[in-house]
Regions:
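Post-DEXD/H (motif II) to motif III coupling segment of the RecA-like Helicase ATP-binding lobe
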Residues: 129-195, 341-342
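Conserved interdomain hinge at the start of the Helicase C-terminal
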Residues: 200-246
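Conserved segment of the helicase C-terminal RecA-like domain
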Residues: 307-349
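Walker A/P-loop NTP-binding motif
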Residues: 18-27, 42-57, 73, 78-81
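Conserved pre-motif I regulatory segment
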Residues: 1-34
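Non-catalytic terminal extensions of ATP-dependent helicases
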Residues: 350-437
Length: 437
């Protein structure tokens, strides 16, 4: 394993990751990995895969199929953070295929992270050379089947004639692996146990609401949790927006996330939550899978998960790797914990005296230039320090996208930054600077 990459990432491999790397690097067989949500499966396949791909070649060598655009984007970012020298690109619906095709020609990625439908489109139009692809990874294989991508995946496999190795990853066990995947000799790695479904390091609480409408109890619960990061799960998009609006009106700094939002809105919501400028994320189950946000302290079930699998994946957003976390069920009148919740739990008593909502230290700004304008993180820091009057210590996480950039900055400096940078140029290009709310 590349120790330089591990040191850069600041991680130590767990048993599942070590076993996966060993199977990929040393057995020559296809690999199936079953491991709980939050155990680090993205690193498990990427760390060995990057050692088998040729960074000096312009050929596309590996395809990673994922069930949704968020996982495609996050997986590409994980690879970027590893600093392997490999070029990658996420491919997903909701944006023009022609634009993706142009970027494919320019970037010449060695690996793509793609949703099945969009990859099929590019293969059908010969935008991708299928002959050079030797590696196939299907991440969240169980979810791909659950979402009904079986026909799309079958079509993809028929168009990839030279696949030599396959890696399938899942948090749950599928009844069978469909024949179209064409698994050869296979190493099966199962790191699931009954005890690991909900790790012991997650503490389970119930909170009683005397009213069917639980918003007041949710407000008090969040007040009692202070500045800790929390995801509030609901089952309906309208409920997400209603709840988020209620919390905003009561002084909380909130992001919300569901499938009807535009892609940029979804990216902004996740970015504000992950960089700490919005410590509360209100979401449907869309946020329960595929999102790699490492430091979520609390999971709150405003609406109960509809299935045990949904419960496991919601709770898997906290206590990732070896960290601790808490999960809360808000119980309305006549509501009881679902039968599948078998862990020990205790009643959470909300203190009578509560402080005002905690205000995060950071806020997020949008800068209207990105990679396509030859803008780097160093350029962003220089611009904000020179033109925006910031110290480097007042700048947090920076995410440079193709056409724009998100930056976490000190909340107390927001108005000053926007005033000072109005009409200013970055690398000779005039740009827009706005707060992301």
């Amino acid at each position: 394993m590349n120790n330089n990459i591990l040191n850069k990432l600041g991680i130590t491999l767990n048993a599942m990751q070590e076993a996966t790397a060993d199977a990929v690097l040393h057995t020559g067989k296809d690999v199936v990995v079953m491991s709980p949500t939050g155990s680090g499966k993205t690193y498990a396949y990427l760390l060995p895969l990057i050692q088998r791909l040729d960074a000096s070649s312009d050929a596309l060598q590996a395809v990673v199929l994922v069930p949704g655009r968020e996982l495609a984007l996050q997986s590409a970012n994980v690879l970027k953070d590893m600093g392997s020298g490999l070029r990658s690109m996420p491919l997903y619906g909701g944006r023009p295929k022609m634009e993706e095709h142009r970027v494919l020609r320019d970037v010449k990625p060695q690996i793509v992270f793609a949703t099945p439908g969009r990859l099929n489109d590019h293969l059908d139009k010969a935008n991708i050379n299928a002959e050079t692809i030797k590696w196939l990874v299907i991440d969240e294989f169980d979810k791909c089947l659950e979402f009904g991508f079986q026909d799309e995946m079958m079509s993809i496999l028929c168009k990839l004639p030279n696949i030599e190795r396959r890696i399938l990853l899942s948090a749950t066990e599928s009844e069978t692996i469909p024949n179209f995947v064409s698994m050869g000799r296979t190493v099966h790695l199962d790191y699931r146990t009954e005890d690991e479904n909900i790790p012991d390091r997650i503490r389970l609480y119930t909170v009683t609401s005397p009213e069917k409408d639980k918003l007041e109890v949710l407000k008090k619960l969040l007040l009692s949790l202070g500045d800790k990061s929390s995801i509030v799960f609901l089952n309906y998009r309208d409920s997400v927006e209603r709840t988020a609006l209620f919390l905003k009106e009561n002084g909380f700094t909130v992001s919300w996330f569901h499938g009807s939002l535009e892609q940029r809105e979804r990216e902004a919501a996740l970015y504000r939550f992950s960089n700490g400028s919005a410590p509360i994320l209100v979401s449907t189950d869309l946020a329960s899978r595929g999102l790699d946000i490492p430091d979520v302290d609390n999971i709150i079930h405003y609406h109960f998960p509809e299935t045990e699998d949904s419960y496991v994946h919601r709770v898997g957003r906290t206590a990732r790797w070896d960290k601790e976390g808490r999960t809360f069920f808000i119980l309305g009148p006549e509501e009881h914990l679902p039968e599948y919740v078998t862990n020990e739990h205790e009643e959470y008593k909300i203190p009578e005296t509560l402080l005002k909502p905690a205000q995060p230290r950071m806020a997020t700004i949008y800068i209207g230039k990105g990679k396509k304008d030859k803008i780097s993180k160093i350029d962003i820091v220089g611009f904000l320090c020179k033109k925006g009057g910031l110290k480097s210590s007042e700048i947090g996480k920076i995410d440079v996208k193709d056409r724009f950039t998100y930056v976490a900055v000190s909340r107390t400096k927001i108005k000053e930054i926007i005033s000072l940078t109005k009409g200013e140029k970055i690398k000779g290009i005039r740009t827009v600077v706005e707060e992301v709310r």
